[in-house]
């Protein structure tokens, strides 16, 4: 049995065959031959193509954020006809934690920031405030994250030391109180630092 394709179907088939080999070909095609499914196909294979679009729909923008959250930057800076929503921000940050840097200030909240920090603790360095209780929990799970906390204080560090001494090698300085907590909760570990009151890492 033979299926006779109309002209548009044949053209679309040729387009699909071409973009499988090179998704960037989509930029050379007339808009009437490129529907949303073709754009999604291309963006999925090469997320950088998204910012080269002229007039993406909200659906395409949401899809682009799900493929690579950093595409939120292009929606914010270039495609200003698109309304950025809470769902779009969540989708972007879930896909790529660095997307938190492009979330509009009015839509930033602690839950969204902490989801980003869970994926990439270094992002804390871009924010002046992070919830102390979150920092305390994160430092137990990822001691190296102490490098990126901007609002760090002695109380938080002491609580982290109580839970695990593994944070100590990442501290530039240990106060007498920190050493005391280390001695009380992890005496074996304390022996490594008891004669170094000024700094663990110079």
Predicted regions and their residues:
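Alpha-helical scaffold segments
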Residues: 1-202
